[in-house]
Amino acid sequence: MAPPRKSRRTDVSNLARSFTARRHELGLTQAELALLAGVGRSTVQAIEGGKDAPQLDGVNAVADALGCDLTLVTRAGAIVEPGER
């Protein structure tokens, strides 16, 4: 049986903390990150605030600017590689 699913809120909170920590590691302000990502500062604030589910295109742009990849993981813990079915 698969482990219990984390709540969506937990996922968004973890994403917010991870992105904020990475931005701090790089010594960037939210405004600088937004400029690098080609998004508005409000997008960075929304992602880091973790209050709502952010738009995927904004998340992808910010992840790319942070030098990060987003990874899809099944509930069983397997990583799904691009192009896999």
Predicted segment positions?
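A short, Lys/Arg-rich alpha-helix, primarily the initiator
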Residues: A2-E25
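Recognition helix of helix-turn-helix/homeodomain-like DNA-binding domains
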Residues: G38-A53
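DNA major-groove recognition helix of helix-turn-helix/homeodomain DNA-binding modules
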Residues: D57-V73
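Short basic helix-loop element that most often maps to the first helix and adjoining turn
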Residues: R17-L35, A61
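Short, charged recognition helix plus adjacent turn
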Residues: A2, L72-R85
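Residue-level recognition of specific faces of alpha-helices
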Residues: D11, S18, E32, T43-A46, ...
